[in-house]
């Protein structure tokens, strides 16, 4: 692949209005530190599909992995107008087979990608020896009607919100970046694991997103000024994405995270947001918390392929 591919990909994105934010060149520049490339599927010199990717070093091997703080990547297809269903399926298969063959030529030790939930088929990858795991996100798609949204929450969540609204909590958008990050890391520390992304990763992405007015930082504090919970959101047109959320373990019993999420949903609705995507999670405790807000469960696919037996062994050993 060459820099010409990146330039063509940038042009492709400019001509593709429905390109998801996590496949936009500015996002890729931020998460990959500009060290990324793109596979391009063409018919008659026209780009119909693209698949950006970046290389990572892990356990001493070169891999292609899902970038940090990025819920989905994978491919995107610019479907021609008035395409018959059978031709749409055929285009998906041809594009996926092409990308699978190109990745096979690159031959990383391991390949992994999370596809956008709009893709319901992975046959082109399946026929080339790739594996698939179904994951789940939750999405609010009726934010124009907050009464309906509230009615879909569990009884416990509705009671909790009503109770907390009477208490002296304040939502801030100006918490210093370092403090915001450190509150989030407390969630991982409680579980005895390291935060999967560094402050530098977060700082770089926030700088790029804030420059485009596409990020929002929320922190909920009590009357003593203690920060109970934080949530980081990326906004893309009428779709908002939750990127991460964390709470101070010593203050978790306040349930302030519930009130914070409801505040964010109300603000998203006020900004004419049509969809709020929680972007996960398959972790039981997180899934339970999100599910009780009554959002729509939406499956999406993780595609992967192991090329190195030694890498696979080390990966299993580490986990």
Model-found features: residue ranges?
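Hydrophobic, Leu/Ile/Phe/Ala-enriched alpha-helical segments that form helix-helix packing faces
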Residues: 13-16, 99-107, 209, 268
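Terminal substrate-recognition subdomain of acyl/acetyltransferases
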Residues: 104, 111-167, 272-275, 280-319
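Short, high-confidence coil segments that cap the C-terminus of an alpha-helix
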Residues: 36, 105-108, 215, 271-273
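Conserved acetyl-CoA-binding loop-helix of GNAT-fold acetyltransferases
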Residues: 85-101, 252-266
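Conserved acyl-donor/pantetheine-binding loop and adjacent beta-alpha core of acyl/acetyltransferases
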Residues: 57-74
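A short, internal acetyl-CoA/4′-phosphopantetheine-binding micro-motif in the GNAT/acyltransferase core
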Residues: 70-86, 143-144, 245-254
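Aromatic (often tryptophan-rich) hydrophobic motifs at membrane interfaces
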Residues: 205-315
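A conserved beta-strand-loop-helix scaffold within acyl/acetyltransferase catalytic domains
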Residues: 2-44, 48-61, 116-253
